């Protein structure tokens, strides 16, 4: 098995690869590495590589038992921000909506929102030490 300690890769199933590229690059500071629209795109932010796989991608094929990979759910990418209130205000001004309000806990503050396909994204501001 090849190990890359400096990159974390996550695959998200999306309904529309082009819309997903626009969302992640416009609102969240990802850069486009490659695309094969309508099947697939590869975007990166820092050491997070996000593989955006549409229904036409190999990752979108049904499993042998018939289950179909679909977007959505509760597992999510976790983006650390310096000021969660400022980021939430910026994204709301762009028309994005959130699943919840900012939740504060002993480790920090978090809030969830969805990409265009319904995949959750968590913004997280660590607690001050």
Where are these regions (language model features)?
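Vicinal oxygen chelate
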Residues: 1-8, 31-80, 88-114, 125-129
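Catalytic core of Fe(II)/2-oxoglutarate
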Residues: 13
């Amino acid at each position: 098995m090849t190990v890359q300690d400096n990159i974390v890769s996550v695959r998200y199933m999306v309904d529309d690869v082009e819309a997903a590229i626009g969302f992640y690059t416009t609102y969240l500071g990802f850069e486009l590495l490659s695309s094969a629209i309508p099947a697939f795109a590869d975007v990166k932010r820092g050491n997070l590589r996000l593989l955006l796989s549409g229904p036409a991608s190999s990752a979108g094929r049904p499993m042998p038992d018939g289950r179909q990979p679909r977007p959505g759910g509760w597992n999510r990418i976790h983006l650390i921000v310096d000021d969660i209130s400022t980021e939430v205000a910026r994204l709301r001004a762009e028309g994005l909506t959130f699943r919840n309000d900012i939740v504060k806990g002993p480790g920090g503050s978090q809030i969830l929102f969805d990409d265009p396909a319904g995949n959750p994204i968590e913004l997280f501001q660590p607690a001050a030490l």
